[in-house]
């Protein structure tokens, strides 16, 4: 089996980008170690701090964020970074070539129940001139690399550099990421969906109708039965989609009118959308292709619908209908 370093060489990924990817991978090994130790190391539980999103930070949110910051500062190729746990962008190296956006511990609410968590990252080219938040506001099409590390029964790295999606598994004895799937591919059709059903009453009419039709199964307009899955960590739900197909969605809702969207564009939706597209799937907000969005702020949130291409198209078809006669959700 190829190691991650050997794979990057075989794909002719340039030296500086390869170095950055290896730094991210090496840091994820240390994060995996911290996650595995859990309560034994006293790293579980919440702090009294909130991040810029107003979410209570877990101890491991802060620990993993600092681990990635320190590693990227030492790497030498990174101009600046943006993190879910940082209010503002962080300048790293004046002559760095890349910008890195990341969610250091996606699904951290799962950590206290020993369920799936992961790290999501996106690599963008660093523009010339002074580093500001605007430097990061590039569409997802500009991503040079994207991936996630899933900390589960095995620690796995899913990676794209624009040449498909490869999956690596961390060998527990050698501590090397080894290539275990050279070409992840999402089947175009599916009978599996992932959504937080507890928010159903807050969704827009198109999503309410779409999910209602899925639940009708063979007796409904879709004429086939669907299974529902929900891990409560985007990294886990998207990994399942990449592994066996499906559709994952976190749609617009009015549960909190000030926050109609849940997932962050720059370090959640964009990297996952690139992975999904590179594996043959589609990713949309319901009204716009995610990778075509022009960001307006670092912590911008968006609705997300991604996965098997034909099923995403089916979902999007509901968003083009007239729901003027439907009861209001207000």
Curated annotation (Swiss-Prot):
Its main location: cytoplasm. This is Fructose-1,6-bisphosphatase class 1. It comes from Shewanella sp. (strain ANA-3). Keywords: Carbohydrate metabolism, Cytoplasm, Hydrolase, Magnesium, Metal-binding. Pathway: Carbohydrate biosynthesis; gluconeogenesis. Its cofactor is Mg(2+). It catalyses: beta-D-fructose 1,6-bisphosphate + H2O = beta-D-fructose 6-phosphate + phosphate. CDD domains: FBPase. Mg(2+) 1 binds at residues 84, 103, 105.
């Amino acid at each position: 089996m190829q190691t991650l370093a050997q794979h990057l060489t075989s794909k002719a990924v340039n030296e500086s980008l390869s170095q950055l990817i290896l730094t991210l991978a090496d840091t994820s090994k240390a994060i995996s170690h911290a996650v595995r130790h859990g309560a034994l190391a006293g790293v579980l539980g919440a702090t009294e701090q909130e991040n810029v999103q107003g979410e209570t930070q877990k101890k491991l949110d802060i620990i993993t964020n600092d681990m990635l910051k320190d590693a990227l500062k030492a790497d030498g190729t990174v101009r600046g970074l943006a993190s879910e746990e940082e209010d503002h962008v962080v300048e790293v190296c004046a002559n760095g070539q890349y910008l890195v956006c990341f969610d250091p511990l996606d699904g951290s609410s799962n950590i206290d129940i020993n369920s799936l968590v992961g790290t999501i990252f996106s690599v963008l080219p660093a523009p010339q001139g002074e580093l500001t938040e605007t430097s990061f506001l590039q569409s997802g099409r500009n991503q040079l690399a994207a991936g996630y590390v899933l900390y589960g029964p095995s620690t796995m790295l899913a990676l794209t550099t624009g040449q498909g999606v490869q999956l690596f598994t961390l060998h527990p004895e050698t501590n090397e990421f080894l290539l275990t799937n050279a070409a992840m591919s999402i089947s175009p059709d599916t009978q599996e969906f992932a959504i937080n059903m507890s928010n159903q009453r807050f969704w827009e009419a198109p999503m309410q109708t779409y999910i209602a039709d899925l639940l009708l199964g063979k007796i409904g307009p879709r004429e086939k039965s669907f299974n529902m899955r929900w891990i409560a960590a985007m990294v886990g739900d998207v990994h399942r989609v990449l592994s066996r197909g499906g559709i994952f969605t976190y749609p617009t809702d009015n549960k909190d009118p000030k926050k109609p969207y849940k997932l962050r564009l720059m370090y959640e939706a964009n990297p996952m959308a690139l992975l999904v597209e590179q594996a043959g799937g589609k990713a949309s907000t319901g009204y716009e292709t995610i990778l075509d969005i022009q960001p307006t702020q670092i912590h911008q949130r968006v609705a997300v619908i991604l996965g098997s291409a034909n099923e995403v198209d089916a979902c999007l078809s509901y968003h083009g209908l007239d729901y003027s006669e439907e009861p209001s959700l207000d």
